[in-house]
């Protein structure tokens, strides 16, 4: 989860988020090299007295500054496309959960279980217990088994919402009348926090998401207790 004065990403807990972190580092390296080159050229122009007033054209230079940016864009686009296709892949999900956005709470339905559904509201600040996080705790957490592929079907009952959990690399729009889907796979147990990431009204800031990822045997006990 995030912590005060954090400058980087949250720790990755899914294969997709790990790939996104690698892609971020790859792109940042390219941006750093380009910025260094531009700063060097600017400083050289400001500090040297040499000029080329007689130069009418420079085919070699024009060729280089056309081909080099194209190569750089390709080195950025190829890994990006790979991750986009990975995010769209859904291979034999262990279960399906339907998520509906409302003003201003989330509702969840475990479609593989009979009558296993609930609403998830933010816990008011006045009701928080010691150690709980303000504006991030909910009355009903989404409990999921660890190391199992989960398909999330996401939509909305009223206005645009967005279901986002940064540490899992997830952000999917909840659109009224449209059903979006994404996959979720956590490689370690724990609590993972997210929030609605699409402005949806006056209480947009009070739509937290809490995923509780547990071993399979604990998930089975929880699902039995909820039925």
Curated annotation (Swiss-Prot):
Mitochondrial intermembrane side stretches: 1-14, 88-227
Residues in the Mitochondrial matrix compartment per record: 46-59
Protein name as annotated: Cytochrome c oxidase subunit 2
Binding site for Mg(2+): 198
Natural source organism: Macrotus californicus
Class in the EC hierarchy, top level: translocase
InterPro entries named in the record: CcO_II, CcO_II-like_C, CcO_II_C, Copper_CuA, Cupredoxin, Cyt_c_oxidase_su2, Cyt_c_oxidase_su2_TM_dom, Cyt_c_oxidase_su2_TM_sf
Cofactor: Cu cation
Assembly, per entry: Component of the cytochrome c oxidase (complex IV, CIV), a multisubunit enzyme composed of 14 subunits. The complex is composed of a catalytic core of 3 subunits MT-CO1, MT-CO2 and MT-CO3, encoded in the mitochondrial DNA, and 11 supernumerary subunits COX4I, COX5A, COX5B, COX6A, COX6B, COX6C, COX7A, COX7B, COX7C, COX8 and NDUFA4, which are encoded in the nuclear genome.
Annotated family: Belongs to the cytochrome c oxidase subunit 2 family.
Protein's membrane topology: Multi-pass membrane protein
GO CC list: mitochondrial inner membrane; respiratory chain complex IV
Highest taxon above the source species: Eukaryota
Any matching Pfam family: COX2_TM
Subcellular localization: Mitochondrion inner membrane
Catalytic activity: 4 Fe(II)-[cytochrome c] + O2 + 8 H(+)(in) = 4 Fe(III)-[cytochrome c] + 2 H2O + 4 H(+)(out)
EC identifiers of the protein: 7.1.1.9
Job description of the protein: Component of the cytochrome c oxidase, the last enzyme in the mitochondrial electron transport chain which drives oxidative phosphorylation. The respiratory chain contains 3 multisubunit complexes succinate dehydrogenase (complex II, CII), ubiquinol-cytochrome c oxidoreductase (cytochrome b-c1 complex, complex III, CIII) and cytochrome c oxidase (complex IV, CIV), that cooperate to transfer electrons derived from NADH and succinate to molecular oxygen, creating an electrochemical gradient over the inner membrane that drives transmembrane transport and the ATP synthase.
SUPFAM superfamilies: Cupredoxins, Cytochrome c oxidase subunit II-like, transmembrane region
GO BP, one annotated term: ATP synthesis coupled electron transport
Molecular function terms from GO: copper ion binding; cytochrome-c oxidase activity
Key words of the record: Copper, Electron transport, Magnesium, Membrane, Metal-binding, Mitochondrion, Mitochondrion inner membrane, Phosphoprotein, Respiratory chain, Translocase, Transmembrane, Transmembrane helix, Transport
